[in-house]
A protein has these predicted regions:
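S-adenosyl-L-methionine
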Residues: 1-28
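Flexible loop/turn segments at secondary-structure boundaries
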Residues: 4-8, 33-38, 100-105, 154-160
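Short glycine-dipeptide loop
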Residues: 52-56, 87-93
Length: 168
């Protein structure tokens, strides 16, 4: 199923297996940053209230146009909003990949795999964003991060891989 289209995924589950997506605990590993990019509807957001400190910039396959980091944060917010109706019962566990600020990376050589992640993902149209923006995007979308089930690797200061349990 297309991770970016939970409505269609739910319909397929109903048709094939007579089960609702909301009746399952949704668990995903490294899929959300690899979803098909959709340009966010910027008019739906108050850009004075949603910010990013991200230094990342990405382009998409169809246009090769470079977009500012805020575009990818807004796209992630919309992605999370699409999933809200389908995670209200049991929640959503995400194992996800993140980038970190290049300055922070340069001060921690050998302590993170951020450079390798950024290079491989940057050339394959996968949009990894900083952990702080990831959590903020989920919060803005109306998801709650259960910190009792939160894990950051290699640590809280250099998070390049996270595990989170989100609920409504």
């Amino acid at each position: 199923a297309d991770i970016g289209n939970p409505k269609k995924f739910n319909k397929e589950l109903e048709k094939k297996y007579n089960i609702q997506l909301n009746d399952l605990l949704s668990v995903r590993s490294f899929l959300d940053h690899n979803r098909i990019f959709e340009m966010p509807n910027i008019k739906n957001f108050d850009l004075d209230k949603i910010t990013t400190k991200s230094t990342s910039a990405f382009c998409t396959n169809d246009t090769n146009k470079i977009f500012e980091p805020i575009i990818f944060k807004l796209s992630l917010i919309e992605h999370f909003q699409k999933w809200k109706p389908f995670i209200s019962k049991y929640g959503l566990i995400l194992l996800e990949l993140h980038t970190i600020n290049p300055k922070k990376c340069s001060l921690n050589i050998g302590k993170t795999l951020a450079t390798a992640y950024d290079a491989t993902h940057g050339f394959s149209n996968q949009y990894i964003i900083e952990y702080e923006d990831f959590i903020d995007s989920a919060t803005i979308a109306g998801l709650k991060n259960n910190q009792a089930f939160e894990y950051n690797f290699p640590n809280d200061k250099l998070t390049t891989v996270s595990i989170n349990l989100f609920s409504l």
